[in-house]
Amino acid sequence: MVVPDSGSDIQPADNGDTDKVMSNSEPELDPNLTTVELEEVRKLQDLVRQLEVQNQTLHNRSRKQVLGGTNNSNLKAGSNINNLHKVMDTSPGAEEAGNLELSPPADSSGSEDMSPLPDTSRVEEQDGFLSLPCSSGSKQTMGWFVTSNCDSGMLGASEASKDQSALDEVDVLDLELCAKAEDEDSWLYVSPKKEVVIEHGPESPLKWCRKVLDHPSPATEVACRTLINRLDQSSRWKNVYSSPSQTSEAGVSASSSAGYLKSTNKTLLTSGSSGYMGVYSALSSQSSVDSELSSDESISMGYKLQDLTDVQIMARLQEESLRQDYASTSASRRSSSASLQSLRRGTYSDQEFDSYSQEDEEDECCSLPQHLQRYSPSPHSSPRCLSPSTLAEYNRLSAPRPRLSRCSLAGGGAKSEEELRHSMPNLTPRTSLRSLEAVRNSRSMEANLQSSGNRTSCLPHSPKGASSSRMRSDGQSPLYLRAPMKALSPVGSMSALRQHAKGPPSAQVGHTEAMRRVQSPGSKNGVGYSGCRTAVVTRQTPGRGMTPASPSSRTRLPQTPRSRSLGMTKPSGHLTDESWKDGCY
């Protein structure tokens, strides 16, 4: 009879299984048990059922409590079972062997109920079960106790494994507690996302921008500083372009900025090639707008434009020397608007300087020959007037070039002033005393060298003319201080000096000196003045640097009796068209 094993087998059974076990054990007890004892057994079964219910409730409570509370409740359940065994020991039919046989099923049902109990309660329960007194002392019951004792050791081992599963359940309960804490952790983990959505979702862009502006990052501050600096630079460039009192010093200081170098490098390099330094041009209305746009582009372009300016300047110089014999009415209109704008700004153009110097010279020499005066081309034949394509190109480049223009020396009046403005170029240069002094010194040195080199060629024709040319090259007239110096290409300066050194074959010395005083020592790109080449005996030959003049320019020039008596047989209008070759390299 292996009752504990059967009890261990039926351990996971329900209450109905316990009733079946008790009913199965009842036929064995029928010949020995009375009805009273059976009633007591049923009462014990009821107590076991109550203990099962109580144990189930304790299991439910233990899931909500810590491990120590569950151990205490299990200990209480074990003490209740021990009390039940004591009641069974004090029952009236306990001396019979049937009662001893009844106890293993009852204990088996109790062990079934108390399966998740710890080892301590199990040991107490087994001790209470093994300490039951045996009043009959029969060998059979003693043998059963021995077998039950041996089986109880095996039962304890199996119950230890069951207790390990109970500890696993306790761990699961602990994990459930941790799961609750994990829910809090997950809530803490999820809540920042929800807060971010709540904060930034309904927030308007204006509030976001306000937050960024109130608390800017370092990168934002750096970007703001660079933007402010660029805006300040652009405003400074606009002030430099639009200021009426622009000097060479202001131009040099402004040229240190990156955007301004694009427009002024061309002027500096062009003037440096001809010894003309520090003269900056006033821009026309359209070219000033283009220059502002190009300066804004140069903010982003940067150093690349500065590298390209050298190549562009040399190319434009060669193109300009080849295009000087083309003219257009639109270019003259633009030049007249530029002259009006420069007059409003209070700047003096080279024509005004020439007209003022011409008025002073007319006081000394009241009448001059027509062909001894400098020819000022009309707007339609001016070499300074450009074609529309080249004008648009120059406006795009927006580089202030020192372009020269020569006006007629006719009597000053409203009509002549208007015609002077029509003969102006698109860009009129501004001058300063410092630049004029520097140019005067450099030009006087070149004139001295050139006149000394050509002295032998001038002596056979007219010694007086050569001496007067040396006097003019050594001692400068007041016109050198007043007339603006123009930027020349190297070929232009050489041709101008070559023709300047040639004297008239036969002319009065005083007349020659007077007409040399009228001459301005500079010319533009080889357009020299051959007014010196007059002869009473010989016929006027077309000079290399002579610019063909239209009849309108000849009607402007005053014709005096002295000019008629000098024997000029061929007017300058019939000159050949080969004057454009002077500007070619």
Swiss-Prot record:
Pfam families documented for this protein: SLAIN
Polar residues: bias regions: 68-83, 425-434, 441-476, 549-563
Keyword check for Coiled coil: yes
Compositionally biased residues, Acidic residues: 351-365
Record field: compositional bias (Low complexity): 327-345
Domain of life: Eukaryota
One Gene Ontology term from the biological process aspect of the record: positive regulation of microtubule polymerization
Keyword annotations from UniProtKB, A to Z: Coiled coil
Name of this protein: SLAIN motif-containing protein-like
Species this chain originates from: Danio rerio (Zebrafish)
